[in-house]
Structure formats: structure tokens, C-alpha cells
Amino acid sequence: MKTQLVVLIVALVFMQLFAQSEAFWSTIWNAAKSLIGKRGLRNLDDLDQFDDSFEPELSEADLKYLEDLLR
């Protein structure tokens, strides 16, 4: 009876390890497929999404607003 319980516990532990490693490998596989695929390569350009939101030049209205804000 003790042997059967030990075998059951060991089997459950190995099943959990396999299930977790399967999820890990499937996540890595899906990430690799998305990077290699045409859509994945096209989406790499979207990483620069914040480039348009930063304007290095300040207009006169911006300077006036900053002066009023800092008074």
C-alpha cells in the first residue's frame, strides 16, 4: 500500500512537471513563430510607437505655457 502511494505521488509530480514544461515550450514556440512569420516581422516596426509622441521642438505656445506653469 505504501509503495502504491509513493508511485502515485511520484507520477503526479512528473505529470505536473510535464504540464508546466509543455506550457513553457509552447510559449517559446509561439513567440518564435510570431517573430519569424510575415506578420511578426511587420509588427517589429510597431516597437517605435512612441517616436511620434515626442516632439523635440518647442513652439512659442509651449514655452508660454511652461512659463505660466512655473510662476
UniProtKB/Swiss-Prot annotation:
Expression (tissue specificity): Expressed by the venom gland.
Residues recorded with modification Isoleucine amide: I36
One of the protein's GO biological processes: defense response to bacterium
GO cellular component assignments: extracellular region; membrane; other organism cell membrane
Location relative to the cell: Secreted; Target cell membrane
Propeptide intervals in chain numbering: 37-71
Signal sequence, start to end: 1-23
Alphabetized UniProt keyword annotations: Amidation, Antibiotic, Antimicrobial, Cleavage on pair of basic residues, Cytolysis, Fungicide, Membrane, Secreted, Signal, Target cell membrane, Target membrane
Role this protein plays: Antimicrobial peptide with potent activity against bacteria S.aureus (MIC=6.25-12.5 uM), E.coli (MIC=50 uM) and yeast Candida albicans (MIC=25 uM) and Candida glabrata (MIC=25 uM). Is not very effective against P.aeruginosa (MIC=300 uM). Also provokes moderate hemolysis on human erythrocytes (HC(50)=10.8 uM).
Protein family (similarity comment): Belongs to the non-disulfide-bridged peptide (NDBP) superfamily. Short antimicrobial peptide (group 4) family.
Protein name: Antimicrobial peptide VpCT2
Originating species: Mesomexovis punctatus (Scorpion)
